């Protein structure tokens, strides 16, 4: 199996970013912005306490403006979008498209259930990588997420 490679531009941009920070005397700086625009999820995976632990804030979502400002404030060239399930966010396409337009490298972590509808709103880009989480092959994954058919839909 061939390993997926990161885009060459990402390697150069990251090296330039680090070099620039070091030359300016900065000892600590972010490489990745971890953006969680919401806590809500469309699964209740065994072993994940998110729904239970975050119950008081499950209905809260970052606005597009707050999300983009957080990324800008961080200054990191890479943005990892997770959550909950980020594809539930009603304006996640706007967030992702804006980040791509600004040439951030975006990794969107998803369970894959809502990915098909988003692929119609977000064009392929060298700045975007979809990270679909699976917990093993079909039987194991569906058992882990406590719902049949999730593996097949995600893959």
Feature locations, PLM:
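Conserved alpha-helical substructure of the radical SAM core
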Residues: 2-121, 125-126
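Membrane-embedded glycan transfer/ligation machinery
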Residues: 34, 131, 151
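Glycine-rich loops and low-complexity Gly/Arg-rich segments
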Residues: 58-60, 105-107, 131-135, 154-155
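Conserved radical SAM core fold
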Residues: 86-88, 112-117, 132-147
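Short, hinge-like loop/turn segments at secondary-structure boundaries
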Residues: 124-129, 148-149
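Glycine-rich S-adenosyl-L-methionine
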Residues: 145-155
């Amino acid at each position: 199996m061939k390993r997926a490679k990161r885009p060459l531009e990402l390697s150069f941009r990251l090296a330039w970013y680090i070099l620039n920070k070091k030359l300016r005397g900065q000892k600590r700086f972010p490489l990745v912005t971890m953006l969680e625009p919401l806590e809500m999820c469309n699964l209740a995976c065994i072993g994940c306490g998110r729904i239970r632990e975050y119950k008081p804030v499950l209905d809260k979502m970052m606005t597009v403006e707050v999300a983009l400002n957080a990324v800008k404030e961080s200054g990191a060239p890479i943005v990892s979008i997770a959550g909950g399930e980020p594809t539930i966010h009603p304006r996640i396409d706007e967030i992702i498209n804006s980040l791509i337009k600004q040439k951030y490298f975006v990794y969107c972590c998803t369970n894959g259930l809502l990915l098909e509808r988003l692929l119609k709103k977000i064009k392929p880009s060298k700045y975007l990588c979809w990270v679909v989480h699976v917990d093993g092959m079909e039987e194991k994954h569906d058992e882990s997420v406590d719902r049949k058919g999730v593996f097949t839909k995600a893959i």
